[in-house]
Amino acid sequence: MREGIHPEYNHDVLVKCACGNTFTTGSTNKELKVEICSKCHPFFTGKQKIVDAGGRVDKFMKKFNLSNEDVK
């Protein structure tokens, strides 16, 4: 590998989640901010939490004139 072209790797980078959870990892960044982590992600918590990007489901339902009863 050539010297001087690779970014500096930090072994103790603090990761902050929107839920308040923090943990450390390794990265070329000095600090990381994430929206969802293993403490608040529905897959790991078992709780149902809707993460809808811009109301895409509602947009789809309106486009095809569907209601919740039609889908079930």
From Swiss-Prot:
Binds 1 zinc ion per subunit. Keywords: Metal-binding, Ribonucleoprotein, Ribosomal protein, RNA-binding, rRNA-binding, Zinc. InterPro entries: Ribosomal_bL28/bL31-like_sf, Ribosomal_bL31, Ribosomal_bL31_A, Ribosomal_bL31_sf. GO terms for cellular component: ribonucleoprotein complex; ribosome. The keyword rRNA-binding applies. One of its GO terms (biological process) is translation. Its cofactor is Zn(2+). One of its GO terms (molecular function) is rRNA binding. Zn(2+) binds at C17, C19, C37, C40. It holds the Pfam family Ribosomal_L31. The keyword Metal-binding applies. Part of the 50S ribosomal subunit. Belongs to the bacterial ribosomal protein bL31 family. Type A subfamily. NCBIfam families: L31, PRK00019.1, PRK00528.1. Binds the 23S rRNA. This is Large ribosomal subunit protein bL31. It comes from Clostridium botulinum (strain Loch Maree / Type A3).
